């Protein structure tokens, strides 16, 4: 399955540049501390087939699952939060114009990640990286 292109900044991003910045400072800090390239490498060829509808990039979806876990959100709540919160969109890698995954897509990605045994190792690796830099992220809490 081919991947969708997300994160290309457009006119709407210029209009919303300041929106959600204050609430997104923690997420921006987290984003700067994590080795996303290494995590993307661990995800490997997540969509081996090039047939069917394009899927969201695996790293983007992993970031969605991280936000969901940290904020204790259900799949429908995560979908709504991505629609509503610019800080979440920016952290995950979506521009203001990008379509975001619906709750079923989030669920399917999580199931595929679990089936490959990658869910716990990837979440633990993110937690380890943040903890090694003085941040402790738990459900609903950030401690530095």
Stretches with model-predicted labels:
Residues 60-72:
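Alpha-helical support elements that line or immediately flank enzyme active sites
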Residues 86-96:
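Short, basic interhelical loop/turn and adjoining N-cap
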Residues 94-144:
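Active-site- or DNA-interface-adjacent structural scaffold in DNA-acting proteins
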Residues 25, 43, 64, 78-82, ...:
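Short, conserved catalytic/metal-binding motifs centered on acidic residues
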Residues 1-37:
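Charged, often Cys/His-bearing segments associated with DNA-binding zinc-finger transcription factors
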Residues 40-53:
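Short, Lys/Arg-enriched N-terminal segment that forms or immediately precedes the first helix
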Residues 35, 52-58, 98-102:
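Secondary-structure capping and boundary motifs in well-ordered enzyme cores
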Residues 73-80, 121:
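Short, solvent-exposed positions on alpha-helices
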């Amino acid at each position: 399955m081919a991947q969708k292109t997300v994160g290309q900044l457009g006119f709407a991003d210029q209009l919303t540049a300041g929106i959600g910045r204050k609430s997104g400072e923690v997420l921006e800090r987290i984003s700067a501390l994590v080795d996303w390239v290494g995590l993307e490498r661990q995800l490997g060829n997540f969509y081996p087939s090039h047939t069917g509808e394009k899927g969201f990039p695996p790293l983007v979806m992993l970031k969605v699952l991280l936000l969901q876990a940290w904020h204790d959100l259900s799949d429908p709540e995560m979908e709504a939060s991505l629609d509503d919160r610019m800080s979440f969109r920016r952290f995950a890698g979506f521009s203001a114009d990008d379509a975001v995954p619906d709750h079923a897509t989030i669920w399917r990605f999580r199931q595929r990640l679990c089936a490959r045994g990658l869910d716990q190792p990837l979440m633990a690796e993110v937690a380890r990286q943040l903890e090694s830099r003085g941040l402790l992220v738990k459900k609903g809490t950030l401690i530095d």
